[in-house]
Amino acid sequence: MSMTAGNVVFVGNIPYDVSEQQMTEIFNQVGPVKTFKLVLDPETGSGKGYGFCEFFDSETTAMAVRKLNNSELGPRKIRVEFPSNDPRRNQSYEYTERTDRYMEQQNAHESSYNSRFIPPVLHSTSSLPASQGGGMPSPAIYSSSMATNLNKNINSTSVPAYNFHNSMTSDFDSASQPHTDAYNARTFQYNKSSQNKGDYTSGTSISNPTSIPLAPSVVQVLSTFSAQELLNMLSKLQTVVHIAPEEARRLLIANPALPYAAFQAMLLMNLVDANVLQQVVVAVKNKNMHQPASATSSPPSVPQKIPSSNHKSQQANGSDQGNEGKRMALIQQLLALTPEQINALPPAQRDQILSIRRQHFRQ
């Protein structure tokens, strides 16, 4: 019996005395089950201890993996995973392998921030209908609320530096977020005259994302996040892209802070190879040097290096600031490229840029 790819989960470590009907009842707690198939031994006719459960949609499939994996069934804990032909399986394993070391280094930091900064949308159980058993909100609900909050922040004339974080935690009680005065003290101004360079609320293309200095505020916000919080944010955004790609595209275009923050989070989690990023930016810079200057746009400039001092402490600070400035310049150059600039590049370089931009959002 064939099953629909993307709607199937692998279930392992099943007790041998459990029937398909019992397993169906268990998985019905997550959502309607289309079919459950135990793999049987052809000689004995008994179960081999694993099987496959098919749902009616991929969203319920992902929810089953999150909610039922390692749940107890008799004396055992069942394994609920994406099958080997589902790209989400490899993505999930890649996150685990690449973040273990980072998370170990952030344990002390995480203990002090988890209670304050985890967005309630990550663990809300009231966003889904009762028939689906609650759990993680659907991508449509998550993306719509995020877009609404981000649009409110971008439309204001003076936007707090922590707008991106505040937009994801708008339902928090302000009393649960100490020290917010220090955060809100750093602000950046949104110049309404820059609207002729791109509409930040209507969903049209952004011709000059760097017209608003998002970099400092986004970097400051993400520096307060633990590894688990960064991973949750990226996983949520990936779910939106996987389930509702068109809605995700409109969300990212309408809110330039969101893709920038996601890309910066990928850098912090070491999900982007710095050497590849450097090669792409250098190639783009060399390509732009051989093209006539455009009347409507110009390639972003690289910040000048901070002059060195005779004092060792000043030299150390200058080196750190210089490295941070270089990294921010690389990110800004990559994100500021217009579709025309990307299409003008040779195919190899163009594919490399698009691959870096989409390597997390596209499977």
Curated annotation (Swiss-Prot):
Query: Which residues belong to the signal peptide in this entry?
Result: none
| Alphabetized InterPro entries for the sequence | CSTF2_hinge, CSTF_C, CSTF_C_sf, Nucleotide-bd_a/b_plait_sf, RBD_domain_sf, RRM_dom
From the record, give the transmembrane residue ranges: none
For the region Disordered, what residue ranges are annotated? 291-325
A Pfam family matched by this chain, by name? Answer: RRM_1
Q: Which GO terms describe its molecular function?
A: mRNA binding
- Which parts of the sequence belong to the RRM domain? 7-85
On subunit structure and binding partners, the annotation says: Interacts with res2.
Entry function: Component of the cleavage factor I (CF I) involved in pre-mRNA 3'-end processing.
Name of the protein described by the UniProt record: Cleavage and termination factor 1
